[in-house]
Structure formats: structure tokens, C-alpha cells
Swiss-Prot record:
Pathway(s) served: Cofactor biosynthesis; biotin biosynthesis; biotin from 7,8-diaminononanoate: step 2/2
Catalytic activity: (4R,5S)-dethiobiotin + (sulfur carrier)-SH + 2 reduced [2Fe-2S]-[ferredoxin] + 2 S-adenosyl-L-methionine = (sulfur carrier)-H + biotin + 2 5'-deoxyadenosine + 2 L-methionine + 2 oxidized [2Fe-2S]-[ferredoxin]
Subunit details: Homodimer.
Record-given protein name: Biotin synthase
Amino acid sequence: MQSTPLNFVPNAAKAPVTPGQAPDARWSREAIEALFALPFNDLLFQAQQVHRANFDANAVQLSTLLSIKTGGCPEDCSYCPQSARYDTGVEAEKLMPIDAVLEAASRAKQNGASRFCMGAAWRNPKPHQLDAVADMVRGVKAMGLETCVTLGMLKQEQAAQLKEAGLDYYNHNLDTAPEFYGEIITTRTYQDRLDTLEHVRDAGINVCCGGIVGLGESVHERAGLIAELANMEPYPDSVPINNLVKVEGTPLAGNEELDPFDFVRTIAVARITMPKAMVRLSAGREAMDDALQALCFMAGANSIFYGEKLLTTDNPEADADRKLLARLGMRVEVQDHMHHESHVGAQSSHCHIDITPAD
């Protein structure tokens, strides 16, 4: 029999917080590090309990991500092949025409996606660029798809414009812990990112915010990223967890491979600390075998990016995704769009589509 919904917050979460952390933080960094230190099976067991209390454990949302403006970005994010500062073979392109974007969105819906994300390699959008993106949002929304964009930094009035267009989610990742951030990016500050997230939240748009693991961060710094996310008020509605995709020409191309179990642990800790968030298995999935992806679902991931490209890096082919989900007995979830202002009603109306692998 289902007991009262579980929101796993150990007593350790009440421990003294780290310097610079708000004294009323829901999760101290020490408590999060304690989760990372749990035996693997214990951590996954707790994460699965939290997941089942808040979601259908056998359902996954399919998202498609389209790069609507590729390359030529002036930023110096050390992991990114779209930076104009690195020779990665990614050529700068113009913003895609609206008709081409809507055609891609239509294909995504036909292939089973319920969420369509649009990414542009900008530091921050100019007024005419934002006007075009707002029109794209309106067109995608008219198809019945959930919408998300990631365009760089936003001003308050720009966030309001996207809200007026009907945008559901704005993605702006923190990437890593504050103290490690300067090792990865120098062209925008951590506070710049927090300011954009505040503008998005104030406009009434759902926040999509996560990070990247495998950048060379320590477990302490990985816990710091989760602490920043989990202690947002409210914590993000959508939390993409990315595994570094090493691209030749970027400063991080020679990084050591992350232990796969450490990636699964990060998914599990995100699920425990942000129980009602959509935890999205994001970049790096192309290099994961089926067993590792299954462990990520067990740990609480309930969304994948679906399609052949994730911005400029490979992503598992759609047919392989369908076959994997079918082998696991998982279903595609098509959720009514929700704005969890206080993360209430995470189990609102939804339907499921059984997955049949293509021949």
C-alpha cells in the first residue's frame, strides 16, 4: 500500500551550512556530500523511493532540442564547441527561419516528443532576435508542445516578452559549483546566471536549470552544484544533468572520463534533493550503454532528449531510444503543462503512450 509521499530529508540536512550559504538552506553541502558517500545501492534505493512518491517510476518524457542558431558564441565556456574562441569545426550560422523551426517541431511531435527546446549560441539576444524567437515559441505552442528556450542572459523585460509569447520553460544552467566556476568560464559571472534565473522566475516562466559533471570538479564541488540548485526558492522545475561531452579543440577535450557510477549518483542526489523536479538525462547519453541509462532511470531520471543531435553533439538515434524504453517496460509520458510555483501537483493529469519499437 502506498504510504504518505516521501520527501527524503535526513537529519544531516540541518547541519551547519557552509560559508556563504544561506542559514535557512534546506540542504547543507555536508548533507549532500553525505548522500554522495552512501553505498551505491542505498543511495539508489532512497532515490527510487522519492521518485515513486512523486512520479510514475515507469514513465519518461521525451524532449527534442534544436539548435536554432549554431556557433559563433563570444563566450569562453571551456566545454562548448560553439565558442568562437575554439577551433572545433563548428561554423557560425545565422538564426534559422521560423518555417524551418516549426517543421522540425512538427517532426519531433510525430516522433513522440511532448517538449520542444530551442537553443541559440548567444551571450544575450538582441531585440530583433528575441522577436523572432517569440514567434517560434508561439508557433510551437500552437502544435500542443511544451516549449523551452535557452538563449543566454536575459533582462527582465526580455523574460516578460517570452512569457507573453507563451514560453513554458527557460533553460539557464549554473554548470558547476560557485568556487569551481571560474575554472570553466570567465566571460560571465555566476551572479549573471543567478540574475537571469531571477528574471525568468519573476516573469512567471518555469525555470530549467542544472549543470555538467565531468568538468574536473571534486565530489565536494559536485555537491556544491546540487546545493545551489536544491536551495533555490523554489528549486527548479526542470533539472538537466549533463555528462561532459569532450570535443576536440575545447580546453576540456583531454579531461579524464567520469566514473559512470558517479554520474548515476548525481542523478540520484538530484532526485532526492529536488523530489518534484523533472530530472533530465541530458548531454553525454550517446556514450552511455543501455545498462547505464537504465541505472539513471532507476536513480530518478524521468526525461531524455530524443533525436539524433543535441545541439552540436551526437545523441542516440530515436529508434534505439524506443527499443531501450520498450525493453525496460517504460512508457512515454505526455504531461499537461504545469507551473509548479511551489512544486505542488506534480502528479497532475497525464497520459501514457506505449512504446512499440520500429521494425
